[in-house]
């Protein structure tokens, strides 16, 4: 039955779900997932959702920071200390103590409380007239254009009253009786209220216009007014409440106000404390905006420990009329006080000395030192701990050192005695073995800070949280320890044993580590500019070495002037700081190293002389230059796009290269590489060159391996392949006899005229589109390693052999009556196959070559003068290089 009645409730637009009692009350922040810091400003709203009309007397808001310590004896009891507290009234009549700000560490923040009543009495008339005129103008605009339902907020006497109008019933004015009643369509009012509610959810403050019914024409108009709260700049409050729906019966009941009640209320206008204490709010979602400012001093990090907590809570209370209980809502703020550990000085070593005074045993002093690397660390980091012991005897203990990271908490509340607590966070156990000769021992261990601990908090009398590293040492070496069930050893019990000492040092755990530009970095940057400019001015001329030589990666190195110099041109060094990649080499390689060494030696010799401090600093800056050229340097990417390829041994002398990429002689490269040292003495410069080399060539850091060309096939294999090609040609009549007669006649290949060059197949066959037919007999076949599928088939008769290939020229073809010879297949060549050379100035083609052969054959040249194809192929060493 109850669920059936719930369906009959009026529906209105709301993003919220009702609670068990039918109402919903909570605090909403504009930035809900933010971590707050001292001095920040908090913006938010107190939202009240009503599913039936109720009388709400007041809505109060308080913001307080508390330190709570639980009782160790009685469960559920404890003490509470207030760091600061702020109170303000969001809805209802302000009282003498409704708006206050109590901060122990700040000045007077509640001066406006005593003057709130005076300001209200002095400005009540102006507030009333302004609101009446605004209400009338807004009602007129709303009746004509329902879409415009907002108006600017009202001010009085220069005091900003940042608040919104509400749908409450107030009878503070007498001019409303003479004002014509305004009417609004209920549907239009609903749309306007929904729009206002949606816009208010974005954080903006809107002013809704109330609606009245036609039944209220004779009785008057319900006032849409609010009670302003005078605030100060430090703690300001805004009050905003929107109604999302209105019903005809509700509005008619609220707008029915008699003239007598208005006149009686006007008589009590001068005393605001006697105004109505409860106002009926309609069905809908009501929003009360507020602004709070967090104090800048006297605060601690939000945390919870075993015996208490430090919290910052925003509490809202809505008091309802009658016996109904008040509504409470809380919102906890996570406050973090920044602690920067970047500039904390390193802690001093903690030293403990124990003097041994016994008659029977050896006397002396045992010294123990505890060192921690830095003064502060962040949560989740690990830090080293070093313990140094100088003993008087040899000690061997398997578990002689216990290093513990612990937290000490000290809390004082309500003028009670301070309460101290300790909690172990991390612990390591290490063996203790002293040297039998020196009786000394150095132990290094590592402790890890848990990520869930809170930062160091101190500087206030109420609470303090410090972190310490405690070391317990068994100097006697008689421990027999067993681990506790929780994994931590109770050091308090160990300290009671004989021959046990302990020492500790403080460690600060911060919230962040900011990067600062130190003065040393700026000085180093200035020195780098000075050194670079000095090198550009003094060592930029030819004949000097600028930080080593640069081999040409692309193999386009230039031969020198006949003295074996190896360089890459006159590339000047850049003077920009940090750019050491554009180095150049000119002249003798050994001259640069000796020049720099002499320069540094001279600078060192001047140091002993009576020079000024400025001159000494200049010499020291010059000493930062590398003492010899680097063995491996990385040029710029624009000048040298790839890595060099060197040849070793006979390959350098025997390899053939084109005219566009000549290589340096082997003795020149060997001399340059040998003259460069393996490891420069300047470590910083060597590391800089190595990193820059890796940026351009990832393999520059590895040992150089000479790049060899792919090994070609042996001449015998090539001859076999060519014979297979000839075997595929169909046999011709008389082929056997002709082959037998010309077996010993060598043939010469056609070259392109360059020693060690290549045969240009397209240019040779450019003038003949079809294979010409020549009558004659050719003794032998002309073969070559083909790189093109294009070939020329020549058939003809010949009675004589061809002359030597060096005398091949373009002559006319002479016909002959000899039998037809087998076809000769001439393929394009990729390399020299014989001593024959074709003049590059002669534009010879395939047909011209065959005509020359036939002409020489017809002239009666002996067959023995033709070169042997097989012999020339086998005797040539650099054919396939």
From Swiss-Prot:
Record-given protein name: pH-response regulator protein palF/RIM8
GO terms of biological process kind: positive regulation of transcription by RNA polymerase II
Organism expressing this protein natively: Yarrowia lipolytica (strain CLIB 122 / E 150)
GO cellular component: mediator complex; transcription regulator complex
InterPro entries named in the record: Arrestin-like_C (IPR014752), Arrestin-like_N (IPR011021), Arrestin_C-like (IPR011022), Arrestin_domain-protein (IPR050357)
Chain spans, region Disordered: 90-223, 242-280, 515-612, 779-881
Matching PANTHER family: ARRESTIN DOMAIN CONTAINING PROTEIN, PH-RESPONSE REGULATOR PROTEIN PALF_RIM8
Superkingdom of this protein's organism: Eukaryota
Summary of the function given for this chain in its UniProt record: Required for the proteolytic cleavage of the transcription factor RIM101 in response to alkaline ambient pH.
Stretches with biased composition (Low complexity): 93-116, 129-177, 269-278, 523-535, 551-560, 787-796, 810-819, 828-845
One matching Pfam family: Arrestin_N
Family statement drawn from the similarity comment of this UniProt entry: Belongs to the arrestin family. PalF/RIM8 subfamily.
